[in-house]
Each structure stands twice: as structure tokens, then as C-alpha cells.
């Protein structure tokens, strides 16, 4: 049981360290791409940005001593450019970005010292369930934006492909958390599909840069 719970806690937190940051950034992309007059869409995007920032902060707080060394050193959680990019984005957009979260991530330690701590398991489960709730709303929001943009009823500087792109990432995050909550782990059969998914995502990143 301890090994299964350790895997559940570690995989959940490693997933959150990567994806909550991405979801916060996606909400930021949506927010900055709407015209000033679209206050409803802008306010909703900003709400999601703030909520996922809180979720990221919670994940970082729980992750110390609970995640793998490979993940912390992979560049998936942060890079040498992350803090500087956040500072510049905050300066240019005037949107509050809590840089202290990245600073805390740099101090994270690897390991799993308290895998039998029921309180930790409960906290991770609550975080998973809260993020699933947020993802349901964010996915619906992105789907509505995509529908309105493709119907020429809403202006945004984001290309439809970018909106589809960040929608797929949110759905993958939701799928991973759902499987963790239902099974306690990620089935190995999904590894091939994950590789294919990220190959497509990276190709689209290259298209956006071009």
C-alpha cells in the first residue's frame, strides 16, 4: 500500500509542477490576447490565471522531499530563464505574476521521506480534486472561445490552432489526474500515446515560432 501511495503522491505532484504552470500561462495567453473591451472574457481568463497560480503554489509547497531528482533537473519544472521571463512579462503586461513560486521551486529537494503520511495523501487528493474542478471550467472556457472565434463572433490575436493546442493540453492534464484518482497510477500502455501527443505538440510549437 505504501508503494502505491508513494507512486500516487509523487506522480500527482510531478504532474502538477509541470501542468499547473502551463495552465497559468495558457490563461495569461488568453487574457493578453483579448481586446480591452472584452471585459467578461478578460476577467474570466484572469480568474483562471490566479486560480492555477494558487494551485501551483500549493503543489510546490507539497512537493518538497516528495518528487524525483530527474524531474527537478529535467527543465520541466523551471529553467534558468523562467524567473527572468516572469519578471519581464510582469513588467510589460502589468499582470501580477508571483515570482516567489519559481524561487521556491529552485529550492525543492528530491525524495519521498513521508510516503505513509496520511495527511500528505489527503492533501494531494484535495489538490487533485480542486484542479480537476478548475480544469472542467478552463476546458469549457477554451472550447467556448474556440467556437466563438471560428464563428467570427470574437476577436483575439491567438490563432485558432493555438487555442486548440492549449485545449488539448488541458484535456491531457484532466485525463492524467482522472486516472490517478481512479487507479492511483498512470497505466504504462498510455506511454506510447503520450509520446505521440507531445511530438504533435512540439511540432505545433515550431509552427508558432515560425
Residue ranges of model-derived segments:
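Surface-exposed peri-terminal alpha-helical interaction modules
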Residues: 2-210
Amino acid at each position: 500500500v505504501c508503494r502505491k501511495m508513494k507512486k500516487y503522491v509523487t506522480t500527482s505532484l510531478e504532474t502538477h509542477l509541470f501542468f499547473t504552470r502551463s495552465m497559468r500561462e495558457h490563461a495569461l495567453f488568453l487574457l493578453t490576447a483579448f481586446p480591452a473591451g472584452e471585459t467578461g472574457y478578460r476577467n474570466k481568463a484572469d480568474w483562471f490565471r490566479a486560480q492555477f497560480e494558487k494551485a501551483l503554489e500549493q503543489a510546490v509547497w507539497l512537493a518538497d522531499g516528495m518528487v524525483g531528482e530527474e524531474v527537478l533537473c529535467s527543465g520541466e519544472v523551471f529553467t534558468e530563464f523562467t524567473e527572468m521571463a516572469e519578471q519581464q512579462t510582469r513588467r510589460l503586461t502589468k499582470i501580477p505574476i508571483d515570482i516567489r513560486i519559481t524561487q521556491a521551486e529552485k529550492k525543492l529537494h528530491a525524495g519521498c521521506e513521508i510516503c505513509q503520511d496520511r495527511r500528505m495523501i489527503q492533501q494531494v487528493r484535495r489538490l487533485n480534486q480542486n484542479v480537476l474542478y478548475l480544469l472542467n471550467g478552463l476546458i469549457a472556457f477554451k472550447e467556448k472561445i474556440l467556437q466563438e472565434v471560428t464563428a467570427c463572433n470574437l476577436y483575439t490575436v491567438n490563432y485558432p490552432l493555438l487555442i486548440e493546442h492549449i485545449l488539448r493540453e488541458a484535456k491531457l492534464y484532466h485525463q492524467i489526474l482522472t486516472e490517478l484518482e481512479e487507479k492511483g497510477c498512470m497505466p504504462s500502455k498510455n506511454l506510447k500515446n503520450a509520446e505521440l501527443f507531445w511530438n504533435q505538440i512540439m511540432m505545433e510549437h515550431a509552427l508558432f515560432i515560425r
